[in-house]
C-alpha cells in the first residue's frame, strides 16, 4: 500500500510541510514516511547503541574538532578552508570554531580490514565503479575512530547509559533505514521482507557515511549491510554546484510550472548519465524540449493519430483481456 506522509507528522515543521507539497507536485509516492523524531526511530537507535556498547565497539574519550554553530555540524580538517583569516565550511560557507569535549567513539579503525574484505567479496556493493574506487582508496588510507556522541547540545536521542550525551548524526540518522522496518523486531514480516535492503540511492557527497560508516556499524552489531549503495552525481547549474551564496539555484517547482514535470524528467534522463554530474539550464532544457519532444515525438504522435483516424475511426477495438492482462493492469 502506498501512503503519503501523514499531515500530522508534518504540521510542526514548515520544512517538512514543504516536503509534502513538493512530493505532490513532483508526483512522487512512498510506502512509508519516517522522521527521526519518531518514537520508533528512537527505539531502533537506542537498541543499536546498546548492542555496540555491549560488544565493546564504543568507548568514552575526548573529542576535538571544528564546529559550526549555524550548521549545527562538526567538520573534518579537509572539509574547511580559510577565508579572509577565518575558518569556514567548504560546503556551506558558515564559520567554524575549534571545540573540545568529552565524546563516545566507535572503533572504526578496527573495521578497516573487514570493510576492505567486504568490498572485495561484494564487488557490486558500491556503484558506480568510480565511487567504489574513491571509497576503497579512503579506507586504505587509514580509518580513525569516529565520534558518535555530543555534549554541546541537548536535542536528539540520549545515550542510554549516559544522559549527558546525545547520539550524534552518524549513528542516529543512518539507523532510519532500520527503524522504518520496525527494527529491532527482526522477526516481523516487514523486516524480513525488506532487510537487507537491495539498494540505497544517495548523493555522492554522503557516500562515505553510507559506504563506510553504515556497513561498519551494521557489521559490528551483527546485522547484514544493504546489498548495494549507489552514489549519484549532482545536478549542476552553469557547470557549478548549486549554492545560495552563488545565486545559481534552479527551483524544480518553478521549472515544472513553466515546462511541465514530464519534460523535466525527460531532459534529466536523456542528458545526465546516471552516476555522473549533469548540467541543466533553461536554454538547454528549452532546446531539448523543442527538438526531441515538440518536433520528433510530436510528429510521431501526429502520424499515429492520423493513422488511427484513417483506419480505425479513432475507436479502440474490442478486446478480451486474459487473466495475465488483468493482473498487469491491476499492478499499474
Predicted feature locations:
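Short, glycine/charge-rich beta-strand/loop segments that flank catalytic centers
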Residues: 32-43, 61-74, 231
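Single conserved hydrophobic/aromatic residue that forms the stacking wall/gate
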Residues: 1-20
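Structured secondary-structure scaffolds
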Residues: 35, 40-44, 48, 88-310, ...
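N-terminal Rossmann-like or analogous alpha/beta NTP/dinucleotide-binding catalytic cores
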Residues: 14-59, 217
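Acidic, turn-prone loop/beta-hairpin segments
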Residues: 312-332
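Cys/His-rich short segments
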Residues: 57-112
Amino acid at each position: 500500500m502506498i501512503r503519503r506522509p501523514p499531515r500530522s507528522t508534518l504540521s510542526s515543521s514548515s520544512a517538512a510541510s514543504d516536503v509534502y507539497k513538493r512530493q505532490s507536485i513532483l508526483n512522487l509516492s512512498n510506502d512509508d514516511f519516517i522522521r527521526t523524531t519518531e518514537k520508533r526511530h528512537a527505539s531502533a537507535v537506542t537498541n543499536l547503541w546498546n548492542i555496540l556498547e555491549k560488544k565493546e565497539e564504543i568507548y568514552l574519550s575526548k573529542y576535538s574538532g571544528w564546529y559550526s554553530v549555524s550548521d549545527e555540524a562538526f567538520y573534518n580538517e579537509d572539509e574547511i578552508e580559510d577565508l579572509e583569516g577565518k575558518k569556514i565550511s567548504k560546503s556551506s560557507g558558515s564559520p567554524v570554531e575549534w571545540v573540545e569535549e568529552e565524546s563516545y567513539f566507535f572503533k572504526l579503525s578496527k573495521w578497516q580490514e573487514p570493510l576492505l574484505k567486504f568490498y572485495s567479496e561484494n564487488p557490486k556493493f558500491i556503484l558506480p565503479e568510480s565511487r567504489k574506487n574513491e571509497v576503497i582508496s579512503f579506507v586504505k588510507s587509514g580509518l580513525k575512530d569516529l565520534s558518535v556522541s555530543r555534549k554541546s547540545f541537548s536535542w536528539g536521542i540520549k545515550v542510554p547509559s549516559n544522559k549527558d550525551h546525545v547520539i550524534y548524526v552518524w549513528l542516529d540518522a543512518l539507523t532510519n533505514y532500520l527503524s522504518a522496518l520496525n527494527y529491532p523486531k527482526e522477526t516481523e514480516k516487514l523486516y524480513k521482507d525488506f532487510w537487507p535492503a537491495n539498494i540505497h540511492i544517495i548523493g555522492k557527497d554522503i557516500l562515505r557515511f553510507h559506504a563506510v560508516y553504515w556497513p561498519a556499524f551494521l557489521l559490528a552489531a551483527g546485522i547484514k549491510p544493504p546489498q548495494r549503495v549507489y552514489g549519484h552525481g549532482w545536478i549542476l547549474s552553469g557547470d557549478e554546484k548549486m549554492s545560495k551564496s552563488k545565486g545559481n539555484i534552479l527551483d524544480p517547482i518553478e521549472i515544472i510550472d513553466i515546462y511541465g514535470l514530464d519534460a523535466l524528467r525527460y531532459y534529466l534522463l536523456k542528458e545526465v548519465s546516471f552516476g555522473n554530474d549533469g548540467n541543466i539550464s533553461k536554454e538547454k532544457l528549452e532546446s531539448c524540449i523543442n527538438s526531441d519532444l515538440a518536433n520528433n515525438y510530436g510528429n510521431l504522435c501526429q502520424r499515429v493519430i492520423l493513422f488511427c483516424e484513417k483506419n480505425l475511426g479513432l475507436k479502440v477495438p474490442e478486446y478480451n483481456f486474459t487473466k495475465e492482462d488483468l493482473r498487469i493492469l491491476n499492478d499499474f
